[in-house]
Amino acid sequence: MEFKHKKKYGQNFLNNKDEILNKIIEVSNIDDNDEILEIGPGQGALTSLLVERVKKITCVEIDKDLENTLRKKFSSKENYTLVMEDVLEVDLRRYINQGTKVVANIPYYITSPIINKIIENKDLIDEAYIMVQKEVGERICAKSGKERGILTLAVEYYGESEYLFTIPREFFNPIPNVDSAFISIKFYKDDRYKNKISEDLFFKYVKAAFSNKRKNIVNNLVTLGYSKDKIKEILNQIEISENERAENISIDKFIELIKIFEGR
């Protein structure tokens, strides 16, 4: 019986497999010592290549209608584990080890929650290679300009991102409304930013700074209770224009800014 894609799970499977899948394997630097977490394996197109190349692969799939297909294809593989659960709810510590690498075509409608889940488990996950909407990929990897936002800085706080390549929408079934991007996130081995400023403080200021993207940094930071004069004084100390928008401020400048506000 033909599989019916479910909109509620954001299912868009690759149909021009070889060209894209081989490129994914190549840029993800797969080797036989890798332990892989694949989120949303679908019908197992990427899984088929990974399972033959890595030490261990754990696939997390929410759609029960795909369980039989996946078990039939891969249950004989000793290095393969299928977890039929919602990736946002599952305790990944039960299934993956330190040094795990994520390689996945993730459901686009929950991109941010999945990235947050990966970040929450960064003590186990060293690197993530994921397919996302092109626009989201550009935002995550943007070094400056209007594409930058809270998600950009959230990723930068924990690791380095890179836009690897674009995948046209025609390569998927059903064809989505947008092109896709394959990106990487490599987590820092040290806590380079966490050692400078806590997560709570960092995100408190970043969320305020981006609370209204049409407003400049001064008008957004007043939501934290500071006067405009105080904000302008501190911005002047670190050579940021009072008319600047948050999207044009680097993570290092943000941390410098927060430290002054917090008297550190």
Curated annotation (Swiss-Prot):
S-adenosyl-L-methionine binds at N12, L14, G40, E61, D86, N105. Keywords: Cytoplasm, Methyltransferase, RNA-binding, rRNA processing, S-adenosyl-L-methionine, Transferase. Coiled coil: none annotated. It comes from the Bacteria. It is found in: Cytoplasm. PROSITE patterns: RRNA_A_DIMETH, SAM_RNA_A_N6_MT. The keyword Flavoprotein does not apply. It is an enzyme of class 2 (transferase). Its EC number is 2.1.1.182. It catalyses: adenosine(1518)/adenosine(1519) in 16S rRNA + 4 S-adenosyl-L-methionine = N(6)-dimethyladenosine(1518)/N(6)-dimethyladenosine(1519) in 16S rRNA + 4 S-adenosyl-L-homocysteine + 4 H(+). One of its GO terms (molecular function) is 16S rRNA (adenine(1518)-N(6)/adenine(1519)-N(6))-dimethyltransferase activity. CDD domains: AdoMet_MTases. Disulfide bonds: none annotated. Specifically dimethylates two adjacent adenosines (A1518 and A1519) in the loop of a conserved hairpin near the 3'-end of 16S rRNA in the 30S particle. May play a critical role in biogenesis of 30S subunits. Belongs to the class I-like SAM-binding methyltransferase superfamily. rRNA adenine N(6)-methyltransferase family. RsmA subfamily. This is Ribosomal RNA small subunit methyltransferase A. The lineage of its organism: Bacteria, Fusobacteriati, Fusobacteriota, Fusobacteriia, Fusobacteriales.
